Amino acid sequence: RGLGDVYKRQVLMEMKNRSKMQDPAEVYTVDMRKELKNGNRSILSEQLQRLMKERLEKKEQTMLFLNRRGYSGFVSCRECGHVIKCPHCDVSLSVHRDGKMRCHYCGYEQTRVKICPECGSDHIGEFRAGTQQIEEIVKTVFPQARVLRMDMDTTRQKDSHEKILSAFANEEADVLVGTQMIVKGHDFPNVTLVGILAADMSLYTDDYRSGERTFQLLTQAVGRAGRGDKKGEAVIQTYSPDHYAIATSAAQDYEAFYEEEIRYRTMMGYPPAENLLAVFISSADEALLETGCRYLKEYMIKAKKDIEASVIGPASPGIEKINDVYRKVIYVKTADYHDLVVLKDRTEKYIEINSGFDKMRIQFDFNPM
């Protein structure tokens, strides 16, 4: 059940016990800032390496989940965990090819930072490790381990997805490395350890729903450990151990997460506490798109004269160009959903009577999920 559904109905249906009444996995949170200070520069923490070694000795299996969902090139400090955020929207800034850091909500931009403004460290940058690199690291640290990798590259061929899962289920591998596709609904009775690498990756995306999505992914991942008769353990590796999405997922506490997340959404004016209208504008002509966005925003500001609303942007919606078509987005925030509908209707009429928008595609999305 999504956070918005719970908010609207004020009803929470909880399933606190597993289907076969197994004990929940024991969850350990590892602060990767301390790992760095202790001289460990590996993506595998000392605790995770020790637990993986135990599994290999017991002939039990391990799943390593690299949390890259929604990854958008955010910049963080490995010394203190500080993430460079937009000063106006409380979402992370994304690094673009021109070296600038931009907010995909309001369009704010700044030059890329090389020194952490919080602690002064030069250990600041983008997270670059992928599943292939993780696989190589595991093989180096544990030469005796049989390792399978499951990601977009290894599942392109027909039936490859099923073959990898079948091989792991048949215990033809000791370790399965993968992205979010390995954590959803799979039951492997011999998996007693799950390692969640870079739990922060989905937490600091340029999306106000990043906390909710992180909580969902981490709780799903933790739930893969100990599905059989053996006790399960999970290790969450993070640079932000005190963030509520990390702490509550480690505790498997949805109620505590919900309370913190709703507080954040209310403070920032994001759904479901308030309503959001996303206006997506696209065109093959970049200059025309820029001009159209400017006129459209100016009109929307005038059109909301009797409506209590904020018009934000235009900004880049994550991916700026798809199939040679350029994209922008304008956001409108207001407490009253009906006001959004009124403003949307007025804007549509304005677009219809202005031929300058004929070579642009304009879409409206209420409270985008």
Please annotate each region the language model reported.
Residues 320-333, 366-369:
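Short, low-order "capping/linker" segments at domain edges
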Residues 337, 345, 349-369:
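Generic C-terminus detector
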